Amino acid sequence: MKKFGLALAAVAAFTGSAVAADMGPRGYSKAPAPMAAVASWTGLWISGGFGFGMMEYNTSVTSVAGTTVFDPGHDTGGKGWLGKVGAGYDYQFIGNFVIGAFADAQFSNIRGQNSFTCPGICLGPTQGYTGQIKNDWSWSVGGRIGYVALPGLLTYFNGGYTQANLKQVDYVFASNGTAVGLSMPSRRMGGYFLGGGTEYAISQIPGLFWKNEVRFSDFGNRTDTQGCGAFGICGVAAAAHSLDRNHLYEQAATTELVYRFNWGGAPVSTKY
């Protein structure tokens, strides 16, 4: 019996050694691939840039009662440079489509000379007057919809509400530049805008984009009271000498740098 037990122990030892030899060294499993970031247009952004704008100012002037026409109507053109800042939020959905909301402000030097000839019934003898129409700032709020045409390239259309500020106009005689005494106070005009553009990723700097946009703005109609001062040919101060009915349009082209705070999106595994 003792010999039988020793024989079993020897067989077990031999069998274990053989099995261990057959198994060989333990295999090595490669670590899973790192999570890769997928570009996403969803998130907050800020922007800043500059551009060039042109305006058209349509105006006509009558007496306060509207019974006398001082100026039947004419157009004034203007142009100038502008600076622009903005911020917004975009959301990418259904693959390559993007929607967003934004607000921006423009600080500009878009101006033109509003010159016209007023008949004798206006202010003394028939003669020419001129005054500078200047849009010195404006702001806009709106939305946009776009399509990611290529990796890192967004094309879009936008629209919304906009408001512009026109500085006070002080008219002078066109012949010698001396004050007429006729003026129109600073005022604001509001309307809508429509535009479109592109955003392109600057690959060397993650999150930085180059945006180019064109925009048309219609600031609507407005009627303003022109006052007269106690100088020039007015002679007597009058808060309401005449009515100026006007309409302002503007077209602008801008180029900006945009920074997106979460460009790259959330990490997504490349192995399933």
What are the residue ranges of the model-derived segments?
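Gram-negative outer-membrane beta-barrel domains
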Residues: 2-272
